[in-house]
Amino acid sequence: MKEEIAATVVFLTMLVKKHKQLSKQKIEKFAAKLTTILFAKYKNHWYAENPMKGQAFRCIRINTYQAIDAVFEKACAESNVDFNDLGLPKEMTIWVDPFEVCCRYGEKNDPFTIASFKGKDGYNAPKRISHAVEKATSDYYSGTSSDEELTNKEPKTIPKVSNPNSIYQCADYSQAIPSWSQYPRRKNYQNNGYPPNPPMPYYPQQKAYKAFRQSSAFSGPRVDRYHWVNMKRSAIS
């Protein structure tokens, strides 16, 4: 843990020196306070047999949309240093794990190794840290900030054409395209915003059937409801 924390502090200190805003005494005091704070934070969350365990807890992160990491906030307060004077990037992530310290600039770049203590790699730690600082501050690894992606790009306009035979000289193309605000807006409907139901189709009223009329051939008095008497036939007989 001692080597990994030392590599982290040296890496951050070299970045602060490149910014040239703090004196040598303030940088050394900040580095000493940061080392003490990291030791106190990692002592119960360091698992050499499983380096991935506790990685999120040991991660040091700087992001535009997040508050200052508690590690930097405490180190700056105890060393009487303004965080903005450190000159650290707007977005940076450092993973302090057993046997390896990695860093990533921006949100889309690939992480790179600051120092590795696996086997013989530990002997080249100072040289590797210096190389990591140069690599991190280069133009390629400066990273794209997440807030830069939110900026609106101005729309490109068609350049003016001096050729009189160009199609862009026609009246149809030279006129500006009307904005959408000139068109009438969609009507607002009542009833919770839904359009009214369409009218029901009109069906003509059907002609009623006529009631059944008894034929004149069966006219006459009725004996009962099943028999009728024909008066003409009874008179002949």
From Swiss-Prot:
Query: Cross-referenced PROSITE patterns, in alphabetical order?
Result: BTG_1, BTG_2
Protein name per its UniProtKB record:
Maternal B9.10 protein
Q: Which family does it belong to?
A: Belongs to the BTG family.
What InterPro entries has UniProt attached to this entry? Anti_prolifrtn, BTG, BTG-like_sf
- SMART domains for this protein: btg1 (SM00099)
Classification via PANTHER family:
B-CELL TRANSLOCATION GENE, PROTEIN BTG4
**GO annotations of cellular component type:** cytoplasm; nucleus
